[in-house]
């Protein structure tokens, strides 16, 4: 939910911060690219280190990265800084968000495959996919509602 929540506010946020449209697009894209690039790395790590350890590391990294992005954006709205600096901080934190998030679906799917009998795997994988889809829909919707309290709220 949180990773996609940013998508609903990036337009307003980028205008407020003076970012060009391509910079806003890059901030959204970089997390997806790093998600894609990091998934196989997290998959190998989950084979070596264990599924739960990788999931917890990924969730912790995601949480810290999201807090860093939020803090960076709040600071950028309150303290004058160059557009280049705002953009660099946004791209770095969004990249970290995508990179750490990649651990979650990779290790979750492996955990299901490792621990459920074959007759229950399909339903469990479908439930995981449905939960991910719900987050993709509900995250931006919730963030849009939270903007009534300001762009910092989501």
Which stretches of residues belong to each language-model region?
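Interfacial helix-cap and linker-helix signal at transmembrane-aqueous boundaries
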Residues: 14, 45-46, 145-148
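Cytoplasmic helix-loop-helix junction between adjacent transmembrane helices
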Residues: 93-132
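Transmembrane alpha-helical cores of Major Facilitator Superfamily
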Residues: 29-33, 60, 126-134, 138
């Amino acid at each position: 939910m949180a990773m996609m929540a940013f998508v609903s506010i990036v337009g307003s946020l980028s205008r407020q911060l003076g970012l060009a449209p391509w910079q806003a697009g890059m901030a959204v894209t970089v997390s997806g690219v790093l998600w894609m690039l990091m998934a196989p790395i997290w998959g190998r790590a989950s084979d070596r280190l264990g599924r739960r350890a990788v999931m917890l590391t990924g969730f912790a990294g995601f949480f810290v990265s999201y807090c860093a992005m939020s803090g960076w954006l709040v600071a950028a709205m309150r303290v004058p800084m160059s557009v280049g600096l705002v953009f660099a901080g946004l791209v770095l934190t969004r990249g970290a968000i995508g990179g750490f998030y990649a651990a979650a679906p990779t290790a979750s799917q492996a955990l299901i495959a490792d621990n459920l009998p074959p007759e229950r795997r399909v339903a469990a994988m479908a439930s995981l996919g449905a939960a991910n889809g719900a987050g993709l829909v509900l995250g931006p919707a919730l963030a849009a509602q939270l903007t009534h309290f300001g762009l910092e709220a989501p």
